[in-house]
Each structure stands twice: as structure tokens, then as C-alpha cells.
């Protein structure tokens, strides 16, 4: 009889909750000008956004699919519903959210997290936010945290128009163009000059609909001398058809400002996660990326930082766990433009049961970026002989005094370490899970404690059945 381990106490079903679909509106599948026009009408877009969407669709139709990275041949946009509106309007009081949707988010811990440690929460269900709230003390500082649709047509409409898809343009790649055509939902954040937002904000994205896509847009502007920590969570139940996530994140870090952007992605194993994230950092500014990627069938995610200002800096800390049937192609990019800029990438990748984990790094030091410093470190842990781990670095250095380095290591779990932990009373499965959690502590130690616990639980879930 198999010994019961601590891992057996972790239940995957909390993430695989499937609500019965009671959509107020579901767009027909596929992607045509008529569908994009109808989506725009449904959302009440201003004229410039409607024109933007149709132009992005034209770019999408003209651009080829990427000829590198994991295969996405199982994804057919003709069988994806690009817009699914839930059966509720956005609420700022949790008790007014419909019970079935509320039950899902409560099982995922969203209300508890808000009460314990968050300054504000946005919760998106399929294509629209169903809940958004910011604490009074944060709003009193002048911090703006609202849904993108309200920002698009309200007080901050001019700011949205100035920044929307200027950093990630529809010409960037085919799925950026798709996003520009059918985006819906997401969050708008503005932190005024000099404001230190000491408590994190969070957005949580849940895709419940079968055969649908989620295309939220996150736009954050941290003004001069200000600071913010923003946390993003994602999940979906598993279906036997493809789902698509092609969100977009644009971050503007002004002079002397600091932004930490943390993400824990736990998409279901039928998800194609083709997300695009980018930050523009001005003089003396800092962008910190914290990234944990655990879900999706195919994942392509490479947050990019443009260090435009002198003395600007970037840090990327990430962990990726690829299990059975997963091909996760992740990494980070940085472009050094200003003088005396610095970047550091510290990543860990774990693969088991035939999973494929690929780390891509891109470091570009432009001609005028004198004194640039960049270091890349990638460590990989393979848990069996069927799995695969690749590291693909790219460097383009155009100044003579740059200091750039890359380090990559690959290894497996030591039998001696497992034996030692078992001698202290652990089961073999728990011992292996503890070692893997320790390997990924580069990310967990950077998260607030509630999210570090959640990440370690996800690792323990992935480790179920890793022996025998």
C-alpha cells in the first residue's frame, strides 16, 4: 500500500472548477471584420478604438505565423470565441457578484487575499471584469486603479489613448495584432509622482468558457519617483478543446520610479498562452519582473524591458515547470539604450514526465549604451530521462565597454539528498517536492507570503505521481 504523503493533501480540483456557462453574450467563433465590428459595438468603443481594432485585424491577416518556437498547430482561431460576456456587470461590492462566479473566486482565495494583504483587487471572468475595488487609503494617495473600459471612456481617456499599444504595437507579431483587434477587460493603473504604494494591487484572470479566448489589456504608468507592486494571477479549468490567452501588458516606469510586476500563471493544460509583456524604463527607474509559469499546453512568454533612460535597471526572476504534454517556451528580453544601465536575469526551469522547457534570453546593447552591464543565469532541473530542457541565449552588443555574461547549468535531483530527507521521516514524494520547491525559491522568496505558499502548493501539485 502506497504511503500517504503531504502532497496527497493538495487538491487540484480547486483550479479545475467548471462553472455551468450562463453567459449573457457569446460571440460567434472565428475572426472577421464583422465580428470585430460587433465586438466593438458591444463594448461601446469610441470611434478611434473601433478604427484601431479593424486596422489591427488587417495587420493580423497580413502577418505570418511565427516560424520558430513551439508548434501551435492545434490552435485554430476559427474555433475560438473571442468574446464571452459573463452574466453580470462589474461590481465594487463582493456581495453583489453572482453566487456561482463568487464561489469560484472564493475557492481560489481572492476575497481572503484582498482582506489580508492587498490594496486593491480586480477579478476578470472570461472577457470582462466582474469585480473591482481599491481601498480608501490607496485612493486617497491619488492612485488610480480601474478597469480598462472605464479608463477608455472616462476621466483618463486621453492618457489611455496616449499610451495604449504604443509600447507593444500590432506590428510586433501576429498575436499582438490579434490582441489589438479583440482585446477586452484588464486593468488601468496610474501612480502619481512621488507616491509610494506600499500595499500591492492584484488582478486575477479566470477563463471559464470552453473554446474561448481571453485578451485582457493591462496598462500601468508609474510616474516620477513613485513605486508600485502589482500582482497578476491566472487560471482556467481543463477542457478537451483549445483555449487561447493572448493578453498584453504595457508598463511605463518614469524617472526615478520603481515597479515590481509579479505573475503566477496556472492555466489549464489545454491552454495556448501567447502573452506579450513590455516595460519602458526612464532615467534612474527600476523594473522588477517576478514570474512563475506552471500551466498551459503551449506557452510563449518573454517579458521585455527597454532601458531607455540613463542609470535605469531591470531584474527578471522566473521559474517554469513543464510537465506531461507541456511545451513551455519562456524567458526575457532587455534592450539597453541609456548609459550605465544594468540588467540581471535569474531563472529556474523544471521539467518532468516528458515536458519540454525552453529558456530564451535576448540582450541587446545599443551603440550609445556605454557602461551597460548585463548578467544572465539559467539553471535547469530535469526530473526524468524523458523530459527536455533547452537554453537559447542571444546577445547583440554594439558598444565596446559593455560587460555582458551568460551562465547555464543543468542537473537532476541527488539520490543522496532524497535519502537524507527520507531518513528524517519524509516520504520519497514529499522529499522530492521539497527539493524542487527549494530549487524554485528564487521566485517564492520574492513574493508576499500568501503567494509564496500558493506557488509551493502548485509545485507540490505538479510533483504528484513523480515516483513509481
Language-model regions, residue ranges each:
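Intrinsically disordered, low-complexity terminal tails
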Residues: 2-20, 25-30, 451-467
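N-terminal amphipathic, basic helical "cap/leader" segment at the start of enzyme domains
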Residues: 2-10, 25-172, 176-177, 346-349
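Short acidic (Asp/Glu) and glycine-rich catalytic loops that position anionic groups and cofactors
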Residues: 18, 33-37, 396-397
Amino acid at each position: 500500500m502506497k504511503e500517504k504523503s503531504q502532497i496527497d493533501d493538495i487538491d487540484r480540483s480547486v483550479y479545475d472548477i467548471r462553472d455551468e456557462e450562463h453567459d449573457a453574450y457569446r460571440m460567434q467563433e472565428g475572426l472577421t471584420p464583422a465580428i470585430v465590428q460587433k465586438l466593438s459595438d458591444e463594448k461601446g468603443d469610441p470611434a478611434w478604438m473601433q478604427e484601431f481594432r479593424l486596422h489591427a485585424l488587417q495587420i493580423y491577416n497580413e502577418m505570418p505565423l511565427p516560424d520558430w518556437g513551439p508548434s501551435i498547430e492545434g490552435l485554430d482561431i476559427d474555433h475560438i470565441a473571442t468574446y464571452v460576456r459573463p452574466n453580470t456587470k462589474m461590481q465594487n461590492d463582493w456581495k453583489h457578484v453572482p453566487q456561482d462566479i463568487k464561489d469560484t473566486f472564493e475557492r481560489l482565495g481572492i476575497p481572503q487575499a484582498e482582506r489580508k494583504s492587498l490594496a486593491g483587487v480586480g477579478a476578470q471572468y472570461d472577457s470582462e471584469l466582474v469585480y473591482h475595488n481599491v481601498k480608501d487609503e490607496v485612493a486617497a494617495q491619488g492612485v488610480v486603479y480601474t478597469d480598462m473600459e472605464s479608463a477608455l471612456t472616462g476621466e483618463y481617456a486621453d492618457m489611455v489613448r496616449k499610451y495604449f499599444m504604443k509600447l507593444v504595437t500590432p506590428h510586433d507579431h501576429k498575436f499582438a495584432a490579434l490582441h489589438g483587434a479583440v482585446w477586452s477587460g484588464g486593468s488601468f493603473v496610474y501612480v502619481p509622482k512621488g507616491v509610494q504604494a506600499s500595499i500591492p494591487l492584484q488582478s486575477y484572470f479566470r477563463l471559464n468558457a470552453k473554446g474561448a479566448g481571453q485578451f485582457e489589456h493591462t496598462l500601468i504608468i508609474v510616474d516620477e519617483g513613485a513605486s508600485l507592486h502589482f500582482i497578476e494571477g491566472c487560471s482556467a479549468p481543463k477542457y478537451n478543446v483549445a483555449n487561447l490567452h493572448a493578453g498584453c501588458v504595457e508598463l511605463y516606469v518614469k524617472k526615478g520610479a520603481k515597479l515590481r510586476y509579479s505573475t503566477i500563471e496556472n492555466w489549464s493544460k489545454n491552454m495556448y498562452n501567447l502573452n506579450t509583456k513590455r516595460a519602458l524604463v526612464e532615467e534612474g527607474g527600476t523594473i522588477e519582473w517576478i514570474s512563475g509559469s506552471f500551466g498551459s499546453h503551449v506557452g510563449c512568454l518573454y517579458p521585455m524591458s527597454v532601458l531607455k533612460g540613463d542609470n535605469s535597471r531591470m531584474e527578471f526572476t522566473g521559474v517554469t515547470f513543464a510537465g506531461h504534454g507541456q511545451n513551455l517556451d519562456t524567458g526575457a528580453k532587455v534592450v539597453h539604450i541609456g548609459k550605465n544601465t544594468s540588467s540581471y536575469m535569474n531563472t529556474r526551469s523544471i521539467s518532468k514526465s516528458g515536458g519540454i522547457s525552453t529558456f530564451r534570453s535576448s540582450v541587446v546593447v545599443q551603440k550609445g549604451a556605454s557602461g551597460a552591464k548585463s548578467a544572465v543565469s539559467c539553471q535547469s532541473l530535469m526530473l526524468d530521462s524523458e523530459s527536455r530542457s533547452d537554453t537559447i541565449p542571444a546577445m547583440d552588443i554594439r558598444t565596446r565597454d559593455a560587460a555582458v555574461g551568460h551562465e547555464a547549468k543543468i542537473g537532476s535531483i541527488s539520490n543522496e539528498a532524497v535519502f537524507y530527507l527520507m531518513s528524517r521521516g519524509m516520504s520519497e514524494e514529499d522529499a522530492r517536492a521539497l527539493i524542487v520547491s527549494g530549487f524554485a525559491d528564487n521566485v517564492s522568496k520574492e513574493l508576499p507570503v500568501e503567494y509564496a505558499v500558493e506557488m509551493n502548493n502548485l509545485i507540490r501539485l505538479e510533483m504528484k505521481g513523480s515516483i513509481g
